[in-house]
Structures are given as structure tokens and as C-alpha cells.
Amino acid sequence: DNPLVRARAQESVEGMVQVYALCSTSIRKQTPLLCDEMDKFREKGLLGAPELQWGNKRKGALWMNEHKQEHFDGMKKIIRSKKKEDELNMILHWLQVPGLGLPKAGFMTQLVMGKGGCMDVHNIRKYLPEVDSSKGTPNRWQTSGQSEETKKRKAVDYLSFCKLAGGAKGLWDQWCDFIAEQYPDAFESGDHVSKLHPIWVS
């Protein structure tokens, strides 16, 4: 299912924006609510969707609306480069968007090119139990207000951690299975959760 999302993100500016909208909408939002929220996005767009009108989500939506073409072009350039550091370049590319820290920039890297991964609150509880997940992104991956050099160093550490936790595919499968267990009334299986991702961005 990830390749379908990837294709959507890479086919057009509109496709990339919709994948970004899914990523931003998913921040601190229960997964079963994403179907309704993405319907609202399709109806009202980036600057009208209710879930994207507050705090950092609003800042990100405004930025993306203004810079979407150049951001899409930059994303495609990284993908076409096929360099060994393309994963790092991509997560740093998405880290430019206001409101996206390393976990969600990693999620966008996962969605648009099948690399990276998302260390969301569920994965932080699982892989870093000593960290207080209620406080959001752990200090080791905080990038707000930090130098480009520090962001790059933290991104390298983040991507290494994702690989140890199973890589983009492993994290995707584990997360989908976990969400299905958490919300059995909403999802039949992890495969069901996975198959919804292309629908959310269609």
C-alpha cells in the first residue's frame, strides 16, 4: 500500500500536498478519525480543512500553500538523484516545513519514497519506554530553533534508530498492526489500516 501513496505523492503537486495534509492531520489525531478529516480536506482544501487551522498545523499549511511547487520540485530532484544520502536529504527537505519535527518529517520520507519512518507517540512508548511520550518528541530528536548542522546530526541519529527498529517497511507493518489492535471496532486488521492510506490520499 505504501507504493500507492508514494506514486500519489510523486505524480503531481496536488498529490504531494494531499499526502502532506494526511501527515499533518495525523498529528495528535486518533487514526479512526482520519477518514472524516481527509473528506473535509478534499472539500475545503489546505487552507480550509478544520484540522489544519490551528497552531503549527496552520503555519505548515500556509507555508505549504505558498511553497508547494518549489517543494515538490525539490522532492522530485532528491528522488531522481538516487544518491546514497537521499533518505537523509529527504528528511531534511521535509524538516523545512513549519510544524514538522523529525518524526513527521520521517513519516513524509516514508510516504513519498518508502524510506525513513515515523517514531510517533506509539513507537516512542514501544522503543523508548524510559522517555515521557506525553511530552512529544524526545530531546535527542528536537530540532526547533537549532542549527542546520545540529538538525543534520539529529536526523542521522533518527534514521539510524528507525533502521534498528525495523526500517520503513517494518515500522509501517508494526504500526498498522498496533493501530488495528487499539481500535478493533474501526479496523479489521493491520492490512485494513495499511490499505486505507492510499484511500486517504486519493
Language model region names:
Residues 20-29, 62-65, 176, 180:
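Short, amphipathic alpha-helical segments that act as regulatory/interfacial helices
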Residues 1-7, 58, 65, 69-202:
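C-terminal accessory module of base-excision DNA glycosylases/AP lyases that mediates lesion recognition
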